[in-house]
From Swiss-Prot:
Belongs to the IspF family. Its EC number is 4.6.1.12. Disulfide bonds: none annotated. The lineage of its organism: Bacteria, Bacillati, Chloroflexota, Dehalococcoidia, Dehalococcoidales. It comes from Dehalococcoides mccartyi (strain CBDB1). This is 2-C-methyl-D-erythritol 2,4-cyclodiphosphate synthase. 4-CDP-2-C-methyl-D-erythritol 2-phosphate binds at D8, V9, H10, D56, I57, G58, S132, T133, S134, E135, F139, R142. One of its GO terms (biological process) is isopentenyl diphosphate biosynthetic process, methylerythritol 4-phosphate pathway.
């Protein structure tokens, strides 16, 4: 078995869509990025790639590449899952945390788990997501951005 961790951060801006775990969440601001800026899914992808010692998402999906402009991060997660399978790895489970002051995410977590599990080809019971705040400290506390951390456990087949 191998373990990997992932981290991602994106800035918030008015007029952008907020997508977390593949779920569009109603909010006056969204995350800025080349793809859909899904900070949670990006952290999960990095944790999976790290567990398999395959680099990070920037290596496979470089910002600025026109084919990834606005793409759903769930589609990228499917590609990462396929890459791991081709390299002989299976996903055991993923756990994650999103840090954001607003919006409150509790009501969206089950749907996020289902979307992420489907993209990874695993049971939703193997996907953990927690939501926390930064207690109004730092750039997250000022609602300038969001952060996500993830850890993945994979096995070699």
């Amino acid at each position: 078995m191998r373990i990997g961790n992932g981290y991602d951060v994106h800035r918030l801006a008015p007029g952008q869509k907020l997508v977390l775990g593949g779920v569009e969440i109603p909010f006056e601001c969204g995350l800025i990025g080349w793809s859909d800026a899904d900070v949670l899914t990006h952290a999960i992808m990095d944790s999976l790639l790290g567990a398999a010692a395959l680099g990070d998402i920037g290596l496979y999906f470089p910002p600025g590449d026109p084919k990834y402009k606005g793409i759903s991060s769930l589609k990228l997660l499917e590609q990462v899952t396929d890459l791991l399978a081709k390299k002989g790895f299976g996903i055991i489970n993923v756990d994650s945390v999103i840090v954001a002051e607003e919006p409150k995410l509790r009501g969206h977590i089950d749907t996020m788990r289902k979307h992420l599990a489907k993209a990874m080809g695993i049971d939703p019971g193997r996907v953990g997501i927690k939501a926390s705040t930064s207690e109004q400290l730092g750039f997250v506390g000022r609602q300038e951005g969001m952060v996500a951390w993830a850890v993945a456990l994979v096995d070699e087949k």
